[in-house]
Amino acid sequence: MAGHSKWANIKHKKAAADAKRGKIWTRLIKEIQVAARLGGGDVSSNPRLRLAVDKAADANMPKDNVKRAIDRGVGGADGANYEEIRYEGYGIGGAAIIVDTLTDNRTRTVAEVRHAFSKFGGNMGTDGSVAFMFDHVGQFLFAPGTSEDALMEAALEAGADDVSTNEDGSIEVLCDWQEFSKVKDALEAAGFKAELAEVTMKPQNEVEFTGDDAVKMQKLLDALENLDDVQEVYTNAVIVEE
């Protein structure tokens, strides 16, 4: 992938996540509650809950916290009032942005999301205005130096759709989002532990930002990420560090 390093971006993302661990735990607890409410408390039969619990483990969340969140979701308390709402919009230069939220007050949430967009040079769009520019997929990223041939064989056998090597040597594996847990288990059983493993909205095309534009775009993305009701922010913008 020309012009920027996938691997550097992932390391930056992980470092930023570590710095916001408390916020990540709060988001994961909400996601676990909602997943348990909608699909039951058994991770073996609830893929969404399984994904959330795996993320909680990766974030070093205590198992007691996870169990309490599942119990609250199944019992209908607290998490029962959360509503899933997706907002779509544009950053500077027309960059596409998707904002997924879990909220108990949609009036508050839409006001906060709209304010973040307008404050940092973006604007909210209508439903479907940018979502078509993304694919809902399972994504795995493996460190440079991973055996490409062995990983490709294991990934394709596990049911992955695509395996590609980036210019920085990292290897990306993509699969249908509904097959994510199955592919993840198979890859780990074959000895491959991904540095990044997630269900995501992957942009079909990316737009690079440098200099002042990169700073402005990062401020918008940070403002959206920092909103309490926001669970995930997806964009086709790539911030190039110079």
Curated annotation (Swiss-Prot):
Predominant place of localization: cytoplasm
GO biological process entries: regulation of DNA-templated transcription
Subcellular compartments: Cytoplasm
Any GO MF annotation of the entry: DNA binding
Cellular component terms (Gene Ontology): cytosol
Keywords from the UniProt entry: Cytoplasm, DNA-binding, Transcription, Transcription regulation
Family: Belongs to the TACO1 family.
Name of the molecule in the record: Probable transcriptional regulatory protein Bmul_0984/BMULJ_02280
Organism: Burkholderia multivorans (strain ATCC 17616 / 249)
